[in-house]
Amino acid sequence: LVGGDTVQGHLSITITICGKAPDKEVLKRTTAEPNDMIFVSGTLGDGRAALSLIQQKKCVSERLLYRFYCPQPMIDLGVELRNLVSSCIDISDGLVSDLTHICNASKVSAVLDVSNLPVHEEVKQLFPDDFAEFGLYGGDDYQLCFTAPESEKAKIINAGMRSNSRITPIGRIVKSMGSNKVMLEGMDVNENISG
């Protein structure tokens, strides 16, 4: 397996953790269903915003630096969600990329409402023309993207509060549209916002 940890350098440390869980408590990519709501935790685009500022040698706030260099895995939230959601993935490569993994594995498509993307106000102010692109395509956020029946929405919001995590509904799973795509208001995301 070749991934994001394959870089040129003098030292590479790879850690693998294995464990067991009851089958009904495993968060999978393969079990999203049409009509499920799509949710994300936290805010999106912070990692991409921080990287852009660092590359431009501009001042970066402590909040963005912390989000970029010290991402926090959403373990507590994942535990809270395990009996509520139909599918789940962490957002490491960007929302569209990672949600596409769910769509492909579950043989469904997704429709996103970009106006609901939870992008932090700081990122919106710093990048007024790019914040939606950062939220859709920026990586290194390590938030969770998950799907669930609408009947579970209140329980999911409560699970977010118990784990101190903001939860935002951002779209809906639909039947596969020929190829398993992530769509924006009925159009291919890549036709609307370049990433």
Where are these regions (language model features)?
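Internal active-site segments that recognize and position negatively charged phosphoryl groups
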Residues: 36-42, 70-95
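Alpha-helical scaffold segments in soluble metabolic enzymes
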Residues: 37, 43, 50-53, 80-83, ...
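A short, charged helix-loop
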Residues: 50-53, 57-72
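Hydrophobic side chains in well-ordered alpha-helices
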Residues: 26, 77, 155-159
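Glycine-rich, charged/polar anion/phosphate-binding loops
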Residues: 2, 22-27, 74-75, 96-99, ...
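Glycine-rich anion-binding loops of enzyme active sites
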Residues: 2-53, 172
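Generic structural "secondary-structure junction" signal
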Residues: 8, 28-29, 40, 46, ...
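Glycine-/charge-enriched secondary-structure boundary and capping motifs
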Residues: 7-11, 18, 83-84, 88-195
